[in-house]
Amino acid sequence: MAHSRARRRKRASATQLYQTCKAAGTCPSDIIPKVEHNTIADQILKWGSLGVFFGGLGIGTGSGTGGRTGYIPLQSTPRPEIPSGPTTRPPILVDTVAPGDPSIVSLVEESAIINSGAPELVPPSHGGFEITTSESTTPAILDVSVTTHTTSTSVFRNPSFADPSVVQSQPAVEAGGHILISTSTISSHPVEEIPLDTFIVSSSDSNPASSTPIPASGARPRIGLYSKALHQVQVTDPAFLSSPQRLITFDNPAYEGEDVSLEFAHNTIHQPPDDAFMDIIRLHRPAIQSRRGRVRFSRIGQRGSMYTRSGKHIGGRIHFYQDISPISAAAEEIELHPLVATAHDTSLFDIYAEPDPDFTEEPVPLSFSTSTPFQRSSVSATPWGNTTVPLSLPGDMFVQPGPDIIFPTASTTTPYSPVTPALPTGPVFISGATFYLYPAWYFARKRRKRVSLFFADVAA
């Protein structure tokens, strides 16, 4: 048999228990302090309020009456009442015109004119004299004679005094009357030259270039090409100076100029002509500077090694440079001799002129010794005049026509003596018409000549 649980009854509230158990003295220990507001919290508020003032907030366990001053009701502005019925316009009074009234309304004229500021004439009440006022409309004409003053000014020039100014200023005169000025504006005496002073305080040159002050020149901004953020790469290809785009791509071989920034777009993986320019997407403008006694040509390149989804590229910056030439000191000046003839030389050397039949030639014998076969030529020399050199050539020789050349000749008063060359000291070996070679070089071993890709003035 299942037992049913007893129903739990609700306990009476503290106020109900206090009303029944107060007189009998059987109230629990927590009922009386709670109803009489004498709990620990009430005691803290009671003794703490002596040192802390909360104003009229009414903080406590009492009823919500707003403290001692109570709550201040908020004043509200009364809303004006709007009538719901139809509104009527107030009538306007209109002056009516009778049928017999004239259509033109005459203006009302004032009977008396009052002049402000004028004294009022009051007629006397008792007998007296009369005041007669007369007014004339004709204006008064005054006979005033105008007196004219004539002022004359004369200027006398002192020839012993030199006026430094060119234009002479006019003297100060009165504004009224007639003014007579007899002076010239431009003087006829010579002008005095005043030297200008220079403002240069200090200068490195011996002679100043101008008379303006030397401006304070600040330090020129240096290009940060050798910082740790840039990778230094030396380029040896000469195309880097004129057309650097040929080292990066094959698509656009057109030359765009050396003073512009070059941009490249690589949609696919490609191999550049130079491996040093791998993944280069931009080359900045060139810069020429001096570096350790050399002229250096530089460009800054931007790599595009990685791209994000937003389109931003990630890559390092590279400093490409190439040394053009060393900066050497000033070369020694060498005096050049004139290559033209003097004024007294009138002889001409004509290679196309025919030999003179009346002129007798004296052949000069020459001895030749060589190990290679050749055709002997007859050479004739004369001390002055035209010189004829007949040559026997193995084939036809093309002669380019040119101008006549004037060479200095020996004087007729001095006997002719041929000049012996200092070098070579040994015998002369001739092979052909215009070529000679030393015999020791005939059997010399020929070496293959290797041409370096560097510039001629750049050290390896």
Curated annotation (Swiss-Prot):
Belongs to the papillomaviridae L2 protein family. Minor protein of the capsid that localizes along the inner surface of the virion, within the central cavities beneath the L1 pentamers. Plays a role in capsid stabilization through interaction with the major capsid protein L1. Once the virion enters the host cell, L2 escorts the genomic DNA into the nucleus by promoting escape from the endosomal compartments and traffic through the host Golgi network. The lineage of its organism: Viruses, Monodnaviria, Shotokuvirae, Cossaviricota, Papovaviricetes. Disulfide bonds join C21-C27. Interacts with major capsid protein L1. Interacts with E2; this interaction inhibits E2 transcriptional activity but not the DNA replication function E2. Interacts with host GADD45GIP1. Interacts with host HSPA8; this interaction is required for L2 nuclear translocation. Interacts with host importins KPNB2 and KPNB3. Forms a complex with importin alpha2-beta1 heterodimers via interaction with the importin alpha2 adapter. Interacts with host DYNLT1; this interaction is essential for virus intracellular transport during entry. It comes from the Viruses. A motif (Nuclear localization signal) lies at residues 1-12, 443-451. This is Minor capsid protein L2. Pfam families: Late_protein_L2 (PF00513). It comes from Human papillomavirus type 55. It is found in: Virion; Host nucleus; Host early endosome; Host Golgi apparatus. GO terms for biological process: microtubule-dependent intracellular transport of viral material towards nucleus; symbiont entry into host cell; viral penetration into host nucleus. One of its GO terms (cellular component) is viral capsid. One of its GO terms (molecular function) is structural molecule activity. The gene is L2. Its main location: virion. The keyword Nucleotide-binding does not apply. Keywords: Capsid protein, Cytoplasmic inwards viral transport, Disulfide bond, DNA-binding, Host endosome, Host Golgi apparatus, Host nucleus, Host-virus interaction, Late protein, Microtubular inwards viral transport, Phosphoprotein, Viral penetration into host nucleus, Virion, Virus entry into host cell. Highly phosphorylated. InterPro entries: Late_L2.
